[in-house]
């Protein structure tokens, strides 16, 4: 059986484990919800949602967890602080166990979410997504002042998508406008439970580096590692030109191949049924 020589860190989220050697623990899947134009969102500013429909989607994840043993991050996406409050309240009302990711392209909304989960007493379940080259001093300070101690740490290097380039972002710094490395920033923020993200990029834009970086992260840092590998296909401009042909169907689940390379988290609530069974099958073979 393949094993890493480097000791592998195992992180605990309310009894649910992530990390370790290949096959040591079940894969963790990230089910994203409330993203732009998501079917459950009625008002993206206030966070008004179709609660019944949203709960049905989450219950599907729980059913698959019972069947496969793979647990889930609920990846909550919002662009406004008020919406974050609504979404987090909803999730903590229907589930008191599983962790959730706080994800946004709006720095102010993420900073607000850090403050809110601290005040609400659920920061131990919250994962900041993500510490990357665009993080500003306001968000660094927001994490520091909060009780959030878990974060996705992104290995995205816009100038060099190779393994060396991604490692430079993670461990050396001086890239993407940041003097410090992403791991150094995470430590400064008080992050005790870092999860590495290899920054999946489309084919032709460094996707090979995304694959190889999984093994590099595990071998060098010994930390839980994964990524949103569906981005490789959904952001692939060549594939979009073939959207109406059968070729899309043959490529859209390509991300499951990455299970064979030791990563620990995934992405996407609508297609979770297919990913869950593929993940379980490959995990058993490992």
Predicted feature locations:
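Catalytic alpha/beta core domains of metabolic enzymes, predominantly
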Residues: 139-286
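Extended, intrinsically disordered, low-complexity segments
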Residues: 2-19, 24, 36, 266-286
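Active-site beta->alpha loop and helix N-cap motifs at the rims of alpha/beta catalytic domains
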Residues: 9-174
């Amino acid at each position: 059986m393949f094993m890493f020589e480097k000791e592998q860190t195992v992180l605990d989220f309310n009894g649910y484990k992530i990390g370790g050697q290949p096959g040591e623990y079940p894969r963790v899947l990230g089910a994203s919800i409330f993203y732009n134009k998501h079917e459950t969102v009625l008002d993206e500013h206030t966070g008004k949602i179709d609660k019944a429909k949203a709960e049905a989607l989450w219950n599907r994840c729980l059913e698959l967890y019972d069947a496969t043993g793979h647990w889930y991050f609920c990846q909550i996406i919002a662009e406004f602080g008020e919406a974050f409050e609504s979404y987090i309240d909803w999730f903590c009302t229907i589930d008191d166990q599983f962790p959730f990711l706080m994800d946004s392209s709006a720095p102010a909304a993420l900073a607000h979410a850090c403050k809110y989960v601290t005040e609400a007493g659920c920061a131990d379940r919250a994962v900041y997504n993500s510490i990357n080259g665009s993080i500003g001093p306001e968000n660094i300070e927001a994490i520091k002042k909060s009780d959030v101690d878990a974060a996705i740490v992104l290995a995205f290097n816009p100038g060099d998508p190779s393994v060396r380039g991604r490692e430079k972002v993670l461990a050396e710094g001086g890239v993407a406008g940041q003097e410090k490395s992403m791991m150094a920033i995470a430590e400064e923020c008080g992050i005790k439970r870092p999860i590495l993200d290899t920054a999946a990029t489309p084919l032709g834009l460094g996707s090979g580096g995304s694959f190889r970086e999984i093994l590099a992260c595990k071998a060098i840092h010994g930390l839980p590692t994964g990524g949103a590998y569906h981005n490789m296909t959904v952001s692939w401009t060549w594939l979009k030109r073939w959207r109406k042909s059968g070729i899309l169907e043959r490529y859209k689940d390509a991300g499951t191949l990455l299970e064979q390379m030791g990563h620990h988290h995934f992405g996407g609530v609508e297609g979770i049924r297919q990913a869950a069974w593929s993940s379980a099958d490959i995990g058993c073979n490992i």
